[in-house]
From Swiss-Prot:
Full protein name: 1-acyl-sn-glycerol-3-phosphate acyltransferase gamma
Any one GO molecular function term: 1-acylglycerol-3-phosphate O-acyltransferase activity
Motif HXXXXD motif per UniProt: ranges: 96-101
Entry superkingdom: Eukaryota
Function: Converts 1-acyl-sn-glycerol-3-phosphate (lysophosphatidic acid or LPA) into 1,2-diacyl-sn-glycerol-3-phosphate (phosphatidic acid or PA) by incorporating an acyl moiety at the sn-2 position of the glycerol backbone. Acts on LPA containing saturated or unsaturated fatty acids C16:0-C20:4 at the sn-1 position using C18:1, C20:4 or C18:2-CoA as the acyl donor. Also acts on lysophosphatidylcholine, lysophosphatidylinositol and lysophosphatidylserine using C18:1 or C20:4-CoA. Has a preference for arachidonoyl-CoA as a donor.
Main location: endoplasmic reticulum
A Pfam family hit: Acyltransf_C
PANTHER family documented for this protein: 1-ACYL-SN-GLYCEROL-3-PHOSPHATE ACYLTRANSFERASE GAMMA, 1-ACYLGLYCEROL-3-PHOSPHATE ACYLTRANSFERASE-RELATED
Disulfide bonds: none
Catalytic function, reaction form: a 1-acyl-sn-glycero-3-phosphate + an acyl-CoA = a 1,2-diacyl-sn-glycero-3-phosphate + CoA; pentadecanoyl-CoA + 1-(9Z-octadecenoyl)-sn-glycero-3-phosphate = 1-(9Z)-octadecenoyl-2-pentadecanoyl-sn-glycero-3-phosphate + CoA; heptadecanoyl-CoA + 1-(9Z-octadecenoyl)-sn-glycero-3-phosphate = 1-(9Z)-octadecenoyl-2-heptadecanoyl-sn-glycero-3-phosphate + CoA; 1-(9Z-octadecenoyl)-sn-glycero-3-phosphate + octadecanoyl-CoA = 1-(9Z-octadecenoyl)-2-octadecanoyl-sn-glycero-3-phosphate + CoA
Species this protein is from: Pongo abelii (Sumatran orangutan)
Cytoplasmic side: 1-124, 340-376
Amino acid sequence: MGLLAFLKTQFVLHPLVGFVFVVSGLVINFVQLCTLALWPVSKQLYRRLNCRLAYSLWSQLVMLLEWWSCTECTLFTDQATVERFGKEHAVIILNHNFEIDFLCGWTMCERFGVLGSSKVLAKKELLYVPLIGWTWYFLEIVFCKRKWEEDRDTVVEGLRRLSDYPEYMWFLLYCEGTRFTETKHRVSMEVAAAKGLPVLKYHLLPRTKGFTTAVKCLRGTVAAVYDVTLNFRGNKNPSLLGILYGKKYEADMCVRRFPLEDIPLDEKEAAQWLHKLYQEKDALQEIYNQKGMFPGEQFKPARRPWTLLNFLSWATILLSPLFSFVLGVFASGSPLLILTFLGFVGAASFGVRRLIGVTEIEKGSSYGNQEFKKKE
């Protein structure tokens, strides 16, 4: 093990990484709050500024994947599809099996220049998660309670608001509604059998309302749907904590592009199209498990230096005064001051750990265990 690899495993560095992310995030959120004054004057200027502010925060997480853990991401697709990346609005459909699936998605967004403007249909609880939810609020992210009767008007209004977005955006949909677990899968397949739908081996039954509504509201804005099927080599089950400890993973993503005009206008037909898509995704996962790769040409988009430079800039600005302060605390010789400082460090580490816990499968939402039994 090299020195750098050894240092990545040391707990003492992790609070420093967390400190940079949290404090820079609070600064960014404050600046975002100030930009609200621009909305009545120039909505598009407000949006462009917030895309760049969000990039400065999200790219720190992408940096952990790309530069800290050196995780590699390989695309399986075709040249024509790759040439369109970052040059059109798109809806992204991604399987929700892994703790860092969102991070792999963000990595691709970063490499094709749409990280700051990326969107997601997110559960309402995330709005109240510090930094993440607050940043999303200023980005006009569409939040839902996952109760369609209550969500319909909110989701439609939020999607239509994005029709004049000034920068290319990728709108992420987790059509399964919740992260895959064996328990949720069993309940989901019971519902599939009751509805006469084919059983899926690697996915939950997709929820069609969000997809059909997004496609309907974003017609004329979005050019295509990108279906992304993600898996990891070596049957690995990566985690954000693993990334923080410098573990390297190899992510493979099969990407298929569907022009939006190929998706039916009728809601029922669009729902059937989505169910068929998930049957195809299941077949792709079966191929991957048998052959260790997806079909299609392989592309490895080069990582860009901006995520690393952004983090190093924030680290230089924030850690220099922190180190001076720490030296002053210990130089004072005051037991009370030292204990207070150590208590603060412990509380901060706990807070960062709670943020990481948002991504953990075993601590994920119970949504889906029983909700699959209800009609959409």
